[in-house]
Design a protein with these regions (language model features):
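Extracellular loop and loop/strand-boundary signature of outer-membrane beta-barrel proteins
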Residues: 182-184, 253-257, 294-299, 345-359, ...
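Signature for the C-terminal beta-barrel architecture of outer-membrane proteins
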Residues: 287-288, 308-517, 530-537, 542, ...
Length: 631
């Protein structure tokens, strides 16, 4: 029996918890030297102790953990921004550190706390959000710059139970996904569970962060051999391995049967150091590049986090003269390895000597690097540029400084052996995004858009070839201040603007890097897919700053040029988030989905296509512990 996920129950599930405990213990007992402020002569011990909490640390010298991108903090801050209370928010670059969030709120505390609710119904909403965020940051207020001082904290302990009926989709590279933006977690029809914890330790400029969980999902039939072969043809990959005469185990095509999953893994696990307002980090870590709530064209949490090295300017930078034009700006650089890309040699050109043929059908496990810069020329406008390159991998040139620089500085499509050989500079994508609080309705409406293009420098340069995710957000409804509305559209279908389909072989795809923009089989960009259109909408009633009732809809439709017969997916979902006290959260979600694809299940389009109905019921319990350990 073929299994895409190895079934085991022994020591694996306990690895994240053991590592978290060991890491927090290690950094707790390790002495870290930091600058100790001078104490005037004659000062008593009690006075020294009372002064400790008043010491203001230099922010550029203190490490601070990132806030996970699936935290409630982000939609809360996005709403506070759209209510026109915070200005220095970089919507297109997430995650933020806890210290960065604290700095965003420092300038508005007096304004919010002293605001008069008379005549402005949104003031009460802003005050609720501010109070919830201040409670979230309560542990950070006592951080000190003293010898052997630090902070170790269990951030959250949680369990997620998910029941699915029907046949769910888990194929963002082709037919679509029932559950999106979920770190590539496994799920199948039946009972699924994810239970874990997160925690961090800080010491001076250094941070250790770990988020691990135990995952369990049922076995499944998944795709038939005929459907898997048809999708392999769509991708331009080889279905059968000539050396073994068995199908390639392609992570992007979930061919069944698939065994039960019982495993432990890290969602995030990284170490970082603070250097002059930069967080330099290594490990598995979150990223979300784009202002949208439902997806990020360049990067999201739709797939498992990659192992990467990152340099992130976490605080805005002001450059004399330049910032008069661009305003303050932030930037980020990331490089890491992708997994789940299977090596396929090209039997027609095994030696790679024919410049007219690629030397491989698909390289194995390439690397990716990306660069992003975002500007805020005014308090109401943000815009950013991003570039991604996927290069190297088994069968191509090794990952070296030389091959990295070649991919970094290559902007034109190479011809002949430059593309087909080992020295291919890689698959290159460019992104652009912006957000703008509209004039005359600054605290009501925020317009934003995310976009990405393949084989062009920027979507601005080639809008007709670009993919787009525009959105608009109404921060509160007139007469109902607790209600907000958000709508986002999404398309990766270039034929809508230039009349020419790319048959699914353009966005998130590349002629050489055929498994393209994926990690462990799932797109790490926007869940909308390779040649699809659709969108999302949400209407949310806020009970408090971190509690709400929400109804949403989602649509996704692949073109018939991409998937034979096309696909259609529609769902309606409801969410309730409620706190018991301030530190125990119940998050429940119900989704009702219809999807159909004529190519399913045989691989041969059949009409009329059978409609699949899927219901997903999820409940999550999360405890945010009160206590921390200081050292």
């Amino acid at each position: 029996m073929r299994r895409n996920m190895k079934e085991h129950v022994a020591i694996g599930p306990f690895i994240p918890y053991a590592t978290l405990l060991a890491g927090l213990t290690l950094i707790t007992v390790a002495p870290i030297t930091a600058q100790q402020p001078a104490t005037p002569k004659g000062t008593g011990q009690s006075e020294r102790d009372s002064n400790r909490s008043a010491i203001v640390c230099e922010p550029s010298l203190l490490g601070s953990p990132y806030i996970p991108v699936d935290s409630w903090v982000y939609p809360a801050v996005l709403r506070l921004y759209s209510l026109a209370y915070v200005d220095q928010v970089y919507l297109g670059m997430r995650p933020w550190t806890r210290a960065s969030l604290r700095h965003m709120l420092e300038d508005i505390d007096a304004e919010i706390e002293d605001a008069n609710t008379y005549g402005d119904s949104s003031v009460g909403e802003a005050q609720d959000i501010y109070a919830a965020l201040i409670h979230f940051l309560r542990y950070d207020a006592g951080m000190k710059c003293l010898t052997n001082q630090g902070n170790s904290h269990v951030e959250s302990v949680y369990t997620v139970s998910r029941g699915i009926s029907g046949t769910p989709l888990r194929d963002s590279f082709h037919l679509g996904s029932t559950v999106i933006n979920n770190y590539g977690r496994p799920y199948e029809s039946g009972f699924n569970n994810y239970s874990g914890m997160s925690g961090y330790a800080t010491a001076g400029r250094f941070v250790l962060y770990v988020r691990g969980e135990f995952e369990a999902a049922p076995s499944a039939t998944r795709y038939s051999q005929g459907l898997a072969q048809a999708l392999s043809t769509v991708d331009g990959t080889t279905f059968l391995n000539a050396a073994t005469n068995f199908p390639y185990n392609q992570a992007t095509i979930p061919m069944g049967p698939i065994g039960t999953t019982t495993d432990g893994r890290f969602l995030e696990a990284f170490v970082s150091g603070r250097v002059i307002n930069h967080e330099i980090s290594f490990g598995q870590q979150d990223d979300w590049l784009g202002p949208g709530l439902g997806g990020g064209m360049a990067y999201s949490n739709n797939a498992e986090n990659i192992y990467s090295f990152r340099i992130n300017r976490v605080e805005p930078l002001q450059v004399p003269l330049l910032s008069r034009l661009t305003g303050p700006f932030r930037y980020e650089f990331l490089i890491g390895s992708l997994r789940g890309h299977i090596f396929m040699p090209n039997p027609a050109n095994p030696s790679g000597t024919n410049p007219n043929l690629p030397n491989v059908i698909n390289p194995g496990d390439p690397w990716v690097h990306l660069e992003k810069i975002s500007f805020r020329p005014t308090k109401n406008l943000e815009f950013g540029f991003e570039r991604t390159a996927i290069w190297g991998g088994k069968g191509h040139g090794p990952i070296t400084i030389h091959t990295f620089l070649k991919s970094f500085f290559s902007f034109a499509s190479p011809g002949g052996n430059g593309k087909n050989g080992r020295d291919d500079p890689g698959a290159r994508f460019g992104a652009f995004d912006f957000s703008y609080r509209l004039p005359f309705v600054r605290n009501w409406l925020t317009l934003y858009s995310d976009s990405e293009v393949h084989d062009d420098v920027s979507p601005i340069d080639a809008p007709e070839r670009a993919s787009w995710r525009p959105g608009i957000y109404l921060s509160h409804v007139p007469g109902i201040p607790k209600l907000d509305i958000r709508v986002e559209a999404a398309t990766t279908d270039p034929s809508r603007s230039n009349g020419a389909s790319q048959y699914g072989r353009f966005m998130y795809y590349e002629a050489i890097q055929k498994q393209g923009y994926t990690n462990q089989g799932q797109l790490f960009g926007d869940w909308i897919g390779r040649e699809d259109k659709g969108g999302q909408a949400w209407i949310t009633y806020h009970l408090s700053g971190n509690e709400w009732l929400e109804a949403g809809v989602r649509n996704q439709k692949a073109t018939t040029f991409f998937i034979p017969g096309g696909t259609t997916l529609n769902d309606i979902n409801f969410q309730v988030v409620k706190r018991i006290g301030k530190d125990f959260e119940i998050n429940s979600n119900f989704a009702y989905e219809h999807w159909k694809a004529p190519i399913y299940p045989t691989g041969i389009p059949t009409y009329p296509a059978g409609q699949q109905t899927v219901t997903t019921t999820t409940i999550q319990f999360t405890w945010f512990p009160e206590r921390k350990i200081s050292f």
